[in-house]
């Protein structure tokens, strides 16, 4: 009889908490390391209390105590970090939010921001960590990491855009090959007049894609700017932080914030972590990696590595006689621009290089444009 009464009491308590927080069911248990912030430990505890009101069972690791939050007492930051790792490893908590963590190569974090133009939420893949030592391979993997995180957050078919940084066009070509192989995802379209899936700064501000793909250093800068632009930079006030570490076979839920993160952002990071628990992020990850590999991911990455090897020295190619260059072909990586022009010279087509508002261009006569495009596509310079 006592067990029945306890069960009924627990059920009514969960219902009451659900009505108060708007979140029903078992609360995800998320640890927060509170020591080490540039804004003091009170800032972290304030965040813990805010998240607790939103349906997160917060385990605060530090020296402060407050009603509604479970405190795990530690004496210093290092002890707190070790305690957090123990709790995650043992399953005492479902995940953790912390200011630093040594992710292995192949794992990087997917941040989440609120974009200023229209208030849209956008995932940035990625923001810390290293998906690969190779830039293009890393951005290909980052795309999958971003899709995983967005799907675990409840977006069934997230749109993907690539920031116009070095490697964007090669990443786009590789992802189109993956798409042709059967991996399902949807491209975002730039809000700029020329469209396309390679996006510009305007698209970042507007939140054009659900998932913005870039290298992690660029992503880190974007997170900092979008979370702290209204405060002068010392206090990250908006957004959800640098996000969870995602990688193949990696099943520890660790979310990253920074020492400059303010209470509102840390609270959002705790909610973000809870959303990943509810969305079964690691089950989603296993399915997405399996689907990508079935579509030829490993072969695409292997081809990318082979293409990145230094080519054997060739005889110097001389330019054909000059002629007016009235046509142009975009979409070539800036590092490949000169080689692309020489590939056309070798075929007897006079070409010049330039930089348009959308990026690098190879220019030639209108009469040679179609043939030049075929040559560049065959050589792998354009998709």
Language-model segment annotations:
Residues 78-82, 171-231, 319-323:
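Active-site rim loops that border cofactor/substrate pockets in soluble metabolic enzymes
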Residues 244, 250-383:
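C-terminal non-catalytic interaction/assembly regions of soluble proteins
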């Amino acid at each position: 009889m006592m067990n029945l009464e306890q069960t009924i009491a627990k059920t009514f308590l969960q219902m009451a908490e659900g009505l108060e927080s708007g979140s029903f069911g078992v609360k995800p248990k998320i640890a927060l390391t509170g020591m080490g912030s540039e804004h003091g430990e009170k800032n972290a505890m304030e965040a813990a209390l805010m998240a607790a009101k939103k349906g997160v069972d917060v385990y605060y690791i530090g020296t402060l105590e407050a009603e509604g939050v479970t405190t795990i007492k530690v004496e210093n930051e290092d002890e707190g970090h070790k305690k957090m790792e123990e709790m995650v490893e043992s399953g005492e908590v479902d995940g953790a939010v912390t200011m630093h963590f040594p992710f292995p190569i192949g794992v990087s974090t997917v941040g989440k921001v609120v974009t200023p133009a229209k208030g849209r939420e956008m995932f940035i893949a990625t923001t810390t960590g290293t998906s690969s030592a190779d830039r293009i391979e890393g951005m290909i993997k980052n795309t999958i990491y971003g899709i995983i995180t967005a799907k675990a957050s409840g977006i069934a078919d997230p749109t993907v855009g690539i920031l116009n940084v070095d490697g964007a066009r090669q990443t786009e070509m590789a992802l189109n090959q993956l798409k042709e192989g059967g991996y399902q995802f949807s491209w975002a379209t730039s809000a700029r007049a020329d469209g396309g899936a390679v996006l510009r700064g305007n698209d970042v501000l507007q939140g054009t894609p659900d998932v913005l793909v870039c290298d992690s250093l660029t992503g880190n800068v974007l997170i900092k700017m979008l979370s702290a632009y209204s405060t002068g930079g010392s206090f990250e006030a908006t957004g959800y932080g640098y996000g969870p570490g995602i990688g193949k076979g990696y099943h520890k839920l660790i979310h990253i914030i920074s020492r400059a993160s303010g209470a509102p952002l840390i609270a959002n990071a705790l909610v973000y972590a809870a959303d990943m628990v509810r969305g079964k992020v690691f089950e989603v990850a296993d399915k997405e990696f399996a689907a990508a590999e079935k579509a030829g991911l490993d072969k695409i990455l292997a081809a990318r590595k082979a293409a990145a090897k230094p080519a054997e020295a060739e005889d110097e190619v001389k330019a054909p006689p000059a002629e007016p260059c009235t046509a142009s072909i975009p979409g070539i990586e800036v590092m490949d621009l000169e080689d692309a022009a020489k590939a056309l010279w070798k075929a007897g087509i006079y070409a010049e290089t330039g930089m348009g508002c959308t990026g690098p261009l190879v220019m030639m006569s209108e009469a040679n444009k179609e043939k030049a495009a075929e040559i560049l596509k065959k050589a792998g310079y354009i998709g």
